[in-house]
Amino acid sequence: MAQQLRFSPDAFGLNGRSLKLLFVVDPLDSLKAYKDSTVAMMRAAEKHGHEVYAAEAASLCWRRPEPGQPGVFCLAYHLHTRPDDHDWYRETGCEILPLKAFDAVLMRKDPPFDSEYVTATWLLERAEAEGARVYNKPRALRD
């Protein structure tokens, strides 16, 4: 029996406020919704009232920030999930946002351990230093 995924805002200490979640993923069209745990996490999060965003690792970028401003950004796609495993999501917009703008950033990209993957972990580590809440610690993924 599959374990039910729960994304309770109280688990994050946010007193019932919905979360703005960013999933750093492989290209969305390459995800197999019927077996991909990331898709299951996105569906569960949305079911519990949270906002779901996705970004490819290649869209993570560094901008030289002004003092006190974030420097790590991504091209984030706002998604709504669907129960259909072939047409499992709908993009409802995209914008360039700092990673710090999200309540949680979840690194869900599968290796290969190539330069894009390593660069993504460096940028995620930098975003963490800027105050972003990054889950799946970048250094642990890389080292």
Predicted regions span which residues?
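Intrinsically disordered, low-complexity segments enriched in serine/proline and basic residues
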Residues: 4-9
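Short, positively charged and aromatic/hydrophobic N-terminal segments
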Residues: 13-15
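Conserved N-proximal alpha/beta basic substrate-recognition cap immediately N-terminal to
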Residues: 17-18, 29-143
